[in-house]
UniProtKB/Swiss-Prot annotation:
Gene: CIB1
GO MF annotations, alphabetized: calcium ion binding; calcium-dependent protein kinase inhibitor activity; magnesium ion binding; protein serine/threonine kinase inhibitor activity; protein-membrane adaptor activity; small GTPase binding; transmembrane transporter binding
UniProt keyword Cytoplasm present: yes
Protein name: Calcium and integrin-binding protein 1
Organism: Homo sapiens (Human)
Residues given in the record as Ca(2+) 1 binding sites: D116, D118, D120, T122, D127
Main subcellular localisation: membrane
């Protein structure tokens, strides 16, 4: 990345370390990868910290390309008014939550937000159906039939919907996730 103007200041690095679960090296790597997505004229530290990278470019990163929830991940972490791009700080937040050192509570909170497709604060039947379709694919050979989908969602709600209101709230989701030892290790993105 070259000259003295192309590195994050020690103060900014320290601030990002305090606010994320990332190490200094991970933050520097994240900044380098973010800058690679920018036009040449926006790659200075000052410009890169103000820049917004469109989702199409973020989604081209190999670390996200194969993730079935990639669009939702970008939407959840985007602070842009149109929810169609990520700033460097949005990108850092994303990487922080998906890092090995993020707490299980943080990971489950963001997983819940990613799976809450309609952003209403609960996982309802439609959210669960979309979740299953993301995981199984929407091809003819992998898509569940309507009856299979209904049975699966009924089973999920039977196991997870503690208050029996027909939806899964955050605490119910976190309760289920707490019984899944592989969740934290599988909910990660490494640059």
């Amino acid at each position: 990345m070259g000259g003295s103007g192309s590195r994050l200041s020690k103060e900014l690095l320290a601030e990002y370390q305090d606010l994320t679960f990332l190490t200094k090296q991970e933050i520097l790597l994240a900044h380098r990868r973010f800058c690679e997505l920018l036009p040449q004229e926006q790659r200075s530290v000052e410009s890169s910290l103000r820049a917004q990278v469109p989702f199409e470019q973020i989604l081209s990163l190999p670390e996200l390309k194969a993730n079935p929830f990639k669009e939702r991940i970008c939407r959840v972490f985007s602070t842009s008014p149109a929810k169609d791009s990520l700033s460097f700080e949005d990108f850092l937040d994303l990487l922080s939550v998906f890092s090995d050192t993020a707490t299980p509570d943080i990971k489950s909170h963001y997983a819940f937000r990613i799976f809450d497709f309609d952003d209403d604060g609960t996982l309802n039947r439609e959210d669960l159906s979309r979740l299953v379709n993301c995981l199984t694919g929407e091809g003819e050979d992998t898509r569940l039939s309507a009856s299979e989908m209904k049975q699966l969602i009924d089973n999920i709600l039977e196991e997870s919907d503690i208050d029996r209101d027909g939806t899964i709230n955050l605490s119910e989701f976190q309760h289920v996730i707490s019984r899944s030892p592989d969740f934290a290790s599988s909910f990660k993105i490494v640059l």
